[in-house]
Amino acid sequence: MTGIPTATISRLVTYLRILEGLEAQDVSRTSSNDLAERAGVTAFQVRKDLAYFGRFGTRGMGYTVPILKRELMRVLGLNQTWNVVIVGVGRLGQAIANYPGASDYQFQYVGLFDVNPELIGQSVRGLTVRHVDELRDFTRTTRVDMGFLAVPPERAQDAAQSLADAGVRGILNFAPTVIQPRLLDRSGQQEISDEWRAVIVENVDFLAGMKRLAFYILNPHLSAVETEENE
């Protein structure tokens, strides 16, 4: 499965959210036109996005909501358990740990890590905060699939490296900086480290979202549909 745009995956998440809402309202069928209207894209875009992963509907009859929801859950990997650790257990990290709904999608928090001696040893959501130096030993006995970073920007790269060193394959970075899957070797030349070769990094930047929002408020003629179709 290659050549799937990042924006397509983001839209699949949106379609899933819409389907969950429809199912909660006891709506049994939907269509590409209906999904498109609710998602703010075109029906063509909906069909194109879904076509990357197979055929889910019936021509002229649309989609069965529970079936399409189940298939999108499968495509997104939400039909299996994902073990998650959080590095950085300050206000943001604790808010992430206590955010409701993660367990509904099989995301299970298994470890919390920090460097602040005032936090180490405390209990958050039933988990004891450990020092980040214990991360590698922790992953030897506990499977960890993802790491969420909620650390200051100047510590983000080192924290991400700790996760990569421990064999964690996915990193969701909430620090206001871009994690680079590169390390400087002793000669000063950049190279991809072995630990980073299989690591997927998602950078979540709240300020970037605010900046995009400001742009679209100032440029309302540039609709979401127009920008998606020209990606």
Tell me the role of every PLM-derived stretch:
Residues 29, 33, 38-84:
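HTH-adjacent hinge/linker in prokaryotic transcriptional regulators
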Residues 92:
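Hydrophobic/small residue at the entry helix of a nucleotide-binding pocket
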Residues 89:
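Glycine-rich Rossmann-fold phosphate-binding loop(s) that bind the pyrophosphate
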Residues 1-28:
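Extreme N-terminal segment that seeds HTH/winged-HTH DNA-binding domains in transcriptional regulators
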Residues 104-125:
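NAD(P)-binding Rossmann-fold cofactor-contacting core
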Residues 15-23, 127-230:
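Phosphate-bearing ligand-interacting subdomains
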Residues 101:
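Basic, low-complexity intrinsically disordered segments
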